[in-house]
């Protein structure tokens, strides 16, 4: 048996909106993910060029961003790994296009606000912290502060 600690999944975030990027990053860190904020489409392209991500890693893309075309960004991200698209709840045609482009899931911002920790925990394969806890569960079952 190995004593090596399990490697935390990565949560890569591509978002122009600082509030949503910060919220996603905070939720990912609370869960124990290794959070990486991508600074624009060029960072996403560099990530994709490195090759496939691990099976637990997740790329979250804010599709309301103005600096890139959302469907193309989701298509590029999905070629490297699992992709979560964040979109407005009232745009069913965009939702369908993002799923067609390869998004694993298209989540409205309201769901991120209301159930973001639970959704990200499920997608990243991480345990959900106890309600009111400031501790993130570690991969070994203990907690880290």
Where are these regions (language model features)?
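Conserved acidic segment of CheY-like receiver
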Residues: 8-18
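Conserved phosphotransfer microenvironments
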Residues: 59-76
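A short, hydrophobic beta-strand element within the central beta-sheet of small alpha/beta folds
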Residues: 81-90
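Alpha4 helix (beta4-alpha4-beta5 surface) of REC/receiver domains from two-component response regulators
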Residues: 90-105
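Acidic, metal-coordinating helix/loop segments flanking the phosphotransfer/catalytic sites
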Residues: 40-58
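Two-component/phosphorelay signaling modules centered on CheY-like receiver
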Residues: 18-36
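Non-catalytic signal-transmission and effector/linker regions of two-component phosphorelay proteins
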Residues: 1-10, 25, 117-145
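Output/docking surface of receiver
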Residues: 102-117
